[in-house]
């Protein structure tokens, strides 16, 4: 599975001065850790450099999507076409889920290959310099479930088109063999 995983407030705020716009949210962070533990997390350079982000994230395979090489052995660095890179990463790691965790540009570029989108809803409206048009980003996705975490909630969306496409391509390959 290739999934986007991010949090927004009531107006789509995602970032403020390289950080999250709202105060630390224990419920969201606990859920984030649970779902990404032992999986692959993919992020852009600004997310990697965020003061809110321990880099690398412990207990996960960290992938940095950047054109600017950093001298680190604890992260895989990739560049080029986002969708092709994500498909290749999935092909080489079939037993792992891939979570794109930010920033906004990486999320937007990855949309064509997303199987799922997980949106944490943080209540309130916060100052931001990074904002997503959530209705536009979720276009073509189907709400599967909403989970209440206490101080926030998580909405899980499925992309039936991508899932069907993957299954169809698998069937075609089997028929050709």
Language-model segments: which ranges?
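Enzymes that bind and transform nitrogen-containing heteroaromatic metabolites
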Residues: 1-177
């Amino acid at each position: 599975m290739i999934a986007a995983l991010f949090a927004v407030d009531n107006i789509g705020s995602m970032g403020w001065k390289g950080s999250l716009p709202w105060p630390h949210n224990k419920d969201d962070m606990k859920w984030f850790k649970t779902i990404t533990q032992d999986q692959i997390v993919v992020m852009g350079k600004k997310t990697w450099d965020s003061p809110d982000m321990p880099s690398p994230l412990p207990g996960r395979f960290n992938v940095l999507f950047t054109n600017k090489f950093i001298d680190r052995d604890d992260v895989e660095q990739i560049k080029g076409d986002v969708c092709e890179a994500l498909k290749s990463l999935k092909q080489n790691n079939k037993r792992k889920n891939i979570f794109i965790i930010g920033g906004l540009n990486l999320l937007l570029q990855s949309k064509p290959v997303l199987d799922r989108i997980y949106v944490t809803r943080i209540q309130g409206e916060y100052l931001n310099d990074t904002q997503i048009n959530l209705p536009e980003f979720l276009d073509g996705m189907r709400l599967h479930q909403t989970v209440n975490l206490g101080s926030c909630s998580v909405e899980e969306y499925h992309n039936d088109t991508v899932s069907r496409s993957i299954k169809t391509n698998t069937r075609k390959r089997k028929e050709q063999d």
